[in-house]
UniProtKB/Swiss-Prot annotation:
This is Bifunctional protein GlmU. Residues 245-429 are annotated as: N-acetyltransferase. The keyword Amino-acid biosynthesis does not apply. SUPFAM superfamilies: Nucleotide-diphospho-sugar transferases (SSF53448), Trimeric LpxA-like enzymes (SSF51161). UDP-N-acetyl-alpha-D-glucosamine binds at residues 8-11, 22, 81-82, 135, 149, 164, 221, 308, 325, 339, 350. Keywords: Acyltransferase, Cell shape, Cell wall biogenesis/degradation, Cytoplasm, Magnesium, Metal-binding, Multifunctional enzyme, Nucleotidyltransferase, Peptidoglycan synthesis, Repeat, Transferase. Binds 1 Mg(2+) ion per subunit. Residues 224-244 are annotated as: Linker. In the N-terminal section; belongs to the N-acetylglucosamine-1-phosphate uridyltransferase family. In the C-terminal section; belongs to the transferase hexapeptide repeat family. It comes from the Bacteria. GO terms for biological process: cell morphogenesis; cell wall organization; lipid A biosynthetic process; peptidoglycan biosynthetic process; regulation of cell shape; UDP-N-acetylglucosamine biosynthetic process. It is an enzyme of class 2 (transferase). Catalyzes the last two sequential reactions in the de novo biosynthetic pathway for UDP-N-acetylglucosamine (UDP-GlcNAc). The C-terminal domain catalyzes the transfer of acetyl group from acetyl coenzyme A to glucosamine-1-phosphate (GlcN-1-P) to produce N-acetylglucosamine-1-phosphate (GlcNAc-1-P), which is converted into UDP-GlcNAc by the transfer of uridine 5-monophosphate (from uridine 5-triphosphate), a reaction catalyzed by the N-terminal domain.
């Protein structure tokens, strides 16, 4: 049975205390709404998002990454509440999966399990450790009797710890029939989607409660909950990679992006941060190193190294306090304290301490190309654009602003000067 998916993302998110819309708050460097959309499009090609607060800003980000998303706008003034969000929604398929835009931890497998039940109305519920302000779910004889919003719950109902996760699967025809019947006769004067359970019950529809994991289905409302969710996501990411054979030393201190890939035997030390679409292949990343959108193969990086975007390392050693950006290094040693930006360096080359590729002239970036088996002495500056042929020696302290031919020794230093007894003359000793 095909499914249409609707994501509710129109709330103000006032508890987040931010100028940025709640669903654009980032979790592991990716907006919450993007985490949800990735899973939604894996399940259906008919995905809609309901927006209101800062609609244009949220819509722009959604369509940049998921251009096939249908965008709807909720009239919060006249139709507030979760049921009000569904006005104007026209599903293309036989049933609808309704998700919340602030639930980025939900796994695709859990949604598939929810969809596997053929009841006309499925409701995701969980046993809450602390029910707080969640809506309470009353279940009798394996069927949902009703959902009571916390604001409207009596003392007895507040004691119930079975809570509404806010995720529904409903037959499209049933939704179309029941939605117009929902009113706003409640304490908040809102149109609650939870009322659809009561209406379905009145028509003797079987409502199936599907129990899910509380942590996975947590809604994120403030910065504290955002931090809890990010920690939870990081634990899952690192657990997965450790099960694939990656060694993490003090994994709780490392950050691994959702799109990072490890291949072969890899080892990651403490306080490492690997971001973006980085690929680490048979490599060791040592303490306190940062890698952004780069490929590291058969290499060791760090400690305290920084690979900025678009670096490609193969069979290379990058030591402490070395920064690379847009650099291709093949069988290279750069042991310490260097900046290698916008460059290509070939096999057998050694980069001495304090080497800099001066790649920016204030207007444009320029490239440095260094060939094979080049020895670069300490404190060398390459003024790009410049090309160093194979088997060259660059003397320490040189500033290289011209191309250097194969096999040459390049020296560029100011003539030294020594003034005898100058100290004694200056201080009259």
């Amino acid at each position: 049975m095909k499914t249409s998916i609707l994501i509710l993302a129109a709330g103000l998110g006032t508890r987040m205390k931010s100028q940025k819309p709640k669903v654009l708050q980032e979790l592991c460097q990716k907006s919450m709404i993007l985490h949800i959309l990735k899973k939604a499009f894996a399940l259906s090609d008919d995905v809609s998002v309901v927006l209101s607060h800062q609609k244009e800003r949220v819509e722009k980000e959604i369509l940049e990454y998921f251009p096939k998303t249908q965008i709807l706008e909720q009239d919060l003034q006249n139709y507030p509440g979760t049921a009000g969000a569904l006005r104007g929604f026209e599903p293309k398929n036989e049933r609808v999966l309704i998700l919340c835009g602030d639930m980025p931890l939900v796994e695709q497998t859990s949604l598939e399990a929810l969809l596997s039940n053929n009841a006309k109305l499925n409701l995701a519920v969980f046993k809450a450790r602390d029910p707080k302000s969640y809506g309470r779910v009353v279940i009798k004889n394996d069927s949902v009797e009703k959902i009571v919003e916390f604001k409207d719950a009596n003392t007895q109902e507040k004691e119930i710890n079975t809570c509404n996760a806010g995720v529904y699967v409903i037959d499209s025809r049933l939704l179309k029939e029941l939605l117009p019947l929902i009113d706003n006769n409640n304490a908040a004067k809102e149109y609650y989607l939870t009322d659809i359970v009561k209406l379905a019950k009145e028509k003797d529809v079987m409502i199936k409660a599907v129990f899910v994991d509380e942590d996975e289905f947590m809604g994120i409302n403030d910065k504290f909950e955002l931090s809890i969710a990010e920690n939870f996501m990081q634990e899952k990411i690192k657990k997965y990679w450790m099960q694939q054979g990656v060694i993490f030393h003090l994994p709780q201190s490392t950050f691994i992006g959702t799109d990072v890939e490890f291949m072969g035997e890899c080892e990651v030390y403490e306080n490492v941060r690997i971001e973006g679409k980085s690929k680490i292949i048979n490599s060791i990343i040592k303490s306190s190193s940062v890698i952004e959108n780069s490929i590291v193969e058969n290499s060791d990086v760090g400690p305290l190294a920084h690979l900025r975007p678009n670096c490609e390392l193969k069979n290379t050693h990058i030591g402490n306090f070395v920064e690379c950006k847009n650099a291709k290094l093949n069988t290279v040693k750069a042991g310490h304290l260097s900046y290698l930006g916008d460059c290509e360096i070939d096999s057998g080359t050694n980069i001495g301490c304090g080497t800099i590729t001066c790649n920016y002239d204030g207007v444009k970036k320029h490239k440095t190309i260094i060939g094979k088996n080049v020895f670069v002495g300490s404190d060398t500056q390459f003024i790009a654009p410049v090309k160093i042929e194979d088997e060259v020696i660059i003397a320490a302290g040189s500033t290289v602003s011209v191309n250097v031919e194969k096999g040459a020794l390049f020296i560029n230093r100011a003539e030294h000067k020594m003034i005898k007894d100058y100290y004694y003359k200056k201080f009259q000793k």
